[in-house]
Amino acid sequence: MMEELHSLDPRRQELLEARFTGVGVAKAPLNSESSNQSLCSLGSLSDKELEQTPEKKQNDQRNRKRKADPYETSQGKNTPRGHKISDYFEFACGSGPGTSPGRSVPPVARSSPQHSLSNPLPLPSQQCSPPSTAPVNPEHSCASFKHISVQHRCTQSDLTMDKISALENSKSSDLEKKEGRIDDLLRVNCDLRRQMDEQKKMLEKYKERLNRCVTMSKKLLIEKSKQEKMACRDKSMQDRLRLGHFTTVRHGASFTEQWTDGYAFQNLIKQQERINTQREEIERQRKMLAKRKPPAMGQTPPANNEQKQRKNKTNGAENEALTLAEYHEQEEIFKLRLGHLKKEEAEIQAELERLERVRNLHIRELKRIHNEDNSQFKDHPTLNDRYLLLHLLGRGGFSEVYKAFDLTEQRYVAVKIHQLNKNWRDEKKENYHKHACREYRIHKELDHPRIVKLYDYFSLDTDSFCTVLEYCEGNDLDFYLKQHKLMTEKEARSIIMQIVNALKYLNEIKPPIIHYDLKPGNILLVNGTACGEIKITDFGLSKIMDDDSYNSVDGMELTSQGAGTYWYLPPECFVVGKEPPKISNKVDVWSVGVIFYQCLYGRKPFGHNQSQQDILQENTILKATEVQFPPKPVVTPEAKAFIRRCLAYRKEDRIDVQQLACDPYLLPHIRKSVSTSIPANAAVASTSGSSNNSLSN
């Protein structure tokens, strides 16, 4: 190694010694041995690093005298240090004789990779390199070398170059993976953005298409509704001539509408008059025939018979006495003619009843058309941007019901438009609106197949609001009874079973509900016939049996006494006293009994053909202590007993809804088993009786 130091360039050796000692570069050439040793000890430093080492300015010479350094000559001039560079390494870095000079240089790569990347340490030569020309204090130089050696020990690490290269490779591979993952995510993000843009475009396209479909649906529905309106009006005009029409008649200073029958009724009336004339003629001829009746066998003719014949001959009438055979023949002819007239009269009567039912429909349609033409919603408006009104179904006191189409759900609905009187006081309007909101809240929570569903509720303006209900195609039970008068017991029992099922649901929910206004007008026939499903509607007078107002013993107070339909309310609703009457779900049980009676007999059990005012004035319901059954039509004793249980006068004796649902008359399996067991027992008795007779014989 010493040979390598001797072969080092003297200039490089001088620069290297100046860097470590802080002594200016001597102009005199140095020995080649020191130069070679310095080059060998710092072989890792390149020439470029040596040339780029910054030089500090020379310190200002102090004026005071100081003790001469051992490195200075007797003349006071600085001379290069006479020691070898290997001695310096032992002094500066504390390396032993056997220590390699290359290990004294603190390698930056031995620190942790994070530290080496984030906070790279400068080389010791760069940290403490003094200017090459300034005089150096030996103590200061020694302290700086000690500081460098301590810093080298602190920054040293056990990492080898293989570990560092492995860490660098792993970090670079992880970095590549992360960059690849980032590229993949960016690519996926771009794809998702592209797909999202495509979906947005597709959504806009579908929205536009849906709007076109809705517009076309509205157009087709309006066109169909207009065609149906024209057909209804054409049919109504034709029926005006056939069935009749209303004419305005003046009575003094007022005008009233009077009904005039059409030609169909006039023709039937003429036929009835003709039949009556023929019947009278036949009866007259029968009386004349009775006068010519021959005497019975064995009887002598009267004495004046010859005189009568002579008198008849003089009058020109040939009324000779008939034989017995001729008399019976003529009598049989008259009987046949009377029987034929009776049959023809029955047919005419049946045709009249049919025409009366058709006339009722015609009158109803005339009123509907008149109300529709005077309605402000006749031109197919779209309410709440959703419900397209098609045609008027009916009109009440303060409301109109329209058949509409829900453009959002794509279904037919019934829209009930409540219109308040503009002349009402604000207090009355608020009360009516509060009542309607209460009905909406009650009806909105109900979900049962026998109860009409309430879909929506919204306001139009300050004086009108709407409720959207389930649409039923058929008519109500009241219209059916007006058309057919009555129905069979099986059909009526089926309707009552469905009503009781709905009432059972109303009393099982929390809080329970009393309908309070059950009547045929609030029972809808889905198919328009008595042999199909029914649905209950109109919860405007319903009572909520909450814990605050309802007592299981006495019931709840009737706060709306006087409301409702009097024919279908029980006697306790008409009791007048200091305190309002107490009611329970037995009110609906009474209504069920009245409806069942009306379906079977075609008339109401109490107050039939009476107005509500007459019922209230005459206390008709308060006097209804017992129900009477007409002899016809024939009804089973079980049905009569069921009606008596429902129409018990005292509410304490009347069954409630839970007992009504478990009534044996409404349980088909029990009735079927009983009915099948009776013929079986009868058959056993008959067989035993026949066997006994055979044994006795």
UniProtKB/Swiss-Prot annotation:
InterPro entries: Kinase-like_dom_sf, Prot_kinase_dom, Protein_kinase_ATP_BS, Ser/Thr_kinase_AS. GO terms for cellular component: cytoskeleton; nucleoplasm; perinuclear region of cytoplasm. One of its GO terms (molecular function) is protein serine/threonine kinase activity. The keyword Glycoprotein does not apply. Residues 46-62 have a biased composition (Basic and acidic residues). Residues 27-136, 289-315 are annotated as: Disordered. Pfam families: Pkinase (PF00069). Its EC number is 2.7.11.1. ATP binds at residues 393-401, 416. Belongs to the protein kinase superfamily. Ser/Thr protein kinase family. This is Serine/threonine-protein kinase tousled-like 2. It comes from Xenopus tropicalis.
